């Protein structure tokens, strides 16, 4: 014998179908296309299993996420909690043997390098001075009060 549905379920299905029929007449074909595209996207992503990254794919993903900073295959010492993970766990263990997300990849990026500050004039060597100042500096250095005496250093 067939399965008998409850009355509220049948009423809901009937009302929902009528609602969809009215909406379908109002919807243009482009709206219908985008709706179908969204449904396909959601169903394909829902049925896809967790993906893993190994080899060149893992390296490409790390280069994309980390950019110019670079990355580590093992976490640097003292990075993250060592109590919940084995000490030798690396990115391959986490993303190749199991699936991992973007945050997990970011954990293996090298830290940002601080921007180099401009050198002050005082910190520059005398060889970095403009030529006119260098000549004055050399002339003044040769005019010492020592006269013709030679000092040994």
From Swiss-Prot:
GO terms for MF: growth factor activity; hormone activity; insulin-like growth factor receptor binding
PROSITE patterns assigned to the protein according to its UniProt record, in alphabetical order: INSULIN
Primary localization class, coarse: secreted
Region C, annotated ranges: 78-89
Pfam families the record matches: Insulin
Basic and acidic residues bias: start-end ranges: 125-138
Sorted UniProt keywords: Disulfide bond, Growth factor, Secreted, Signal
Biased composition (Polar residues): 142-153
Region (A): 90-110
Cysteine disulfide links: 54-96, 66-109, 95-100
Residue segments, region D: 111-118
Domain of life, per lineage: Eukaryota
Ranges for region Disordered: 120-153
InterPro entries in the cross-refs: IGF-I, Insulin-like, Insulin-like_growth_factor, Insulin-like_sf, Insulin_CS, Insulin_family
Annotated segments matching region B: 49-77
Entry's Gene Ontology BP terms: cell population proliferation; insulin-like growth factor receptor signaling pathway; negative regulation of apoptotic process; negative regulation of release of cytochrome c from mitochondria; negative regulation of smooth muscle cell apoptotic process; positive regulation of cell population proliferation; positive regulation of D-glucose import; positive regulation of glycogen biosynthetic process
Propeptide: 119-153
The family this protein is said to belong to: Belongs to the insulin family.
Function noted in UniProt: The insulin-like growth factors, isolated from plasma, are structurally and functionally related to insulin but have a much higher growth-promoting activity. May be a physiological regulator of [1-14C]-2-deoxy-D-glucose (2DG) transport and glycogen synthesis in osteoblasts. Stimulates glucose transport in bone-derived osteoblastic (PyMS) cells and is effective at much lower concentrations than insulin, not only regarding glycogen and DNA synthesis but also with regard to enhancing glucose uptake. May play a role in synapse maturation.
Self-association state and partner proteins as the record states: Forms a ternary complex with IGFR1 and ITGAV:ITGB3. Forms a ternary complex with IGFR1 and ITGA6:ITGB4. Forms a ternary complex with IGFBP3 and ALS.
Protein name: Insulin-like growth factor 1
Gene transcribed to yield this protein: IGF1
């Amino acid at each position: 014998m067939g399965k008998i549905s409850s009355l509220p379920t049948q009423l809901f299905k009937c009302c929902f179908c009528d609602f969809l029929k009215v909406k379908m007449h109002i919807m243009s074909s482009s709206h219908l296309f985008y709706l179908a595209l969204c449904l396909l996207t959601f169903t394909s992503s829902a049925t896809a299993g967790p993906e893993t990254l190994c080899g060149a794919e893992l390296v490409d993903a790390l280069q994309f996420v980390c950019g110019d900073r670079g990355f580590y295959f093992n976490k640097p010492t003292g990075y993250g909690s060592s109590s919940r993970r084995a000490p030798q766990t690396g990115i391959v263990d986490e993303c190749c043997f199991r699936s991992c997300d973007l945050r997990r990849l970011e954990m293996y990026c090298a830290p940002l390098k601080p921007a180099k500050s401009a050198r002050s004039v005082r910190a520059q060597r005398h060889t970095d001075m403009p030529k006119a100042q260098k000549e004055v500096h050399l002339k003044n250095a040769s005019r010492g009060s020592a006269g013709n005496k030679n000092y040994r250093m």
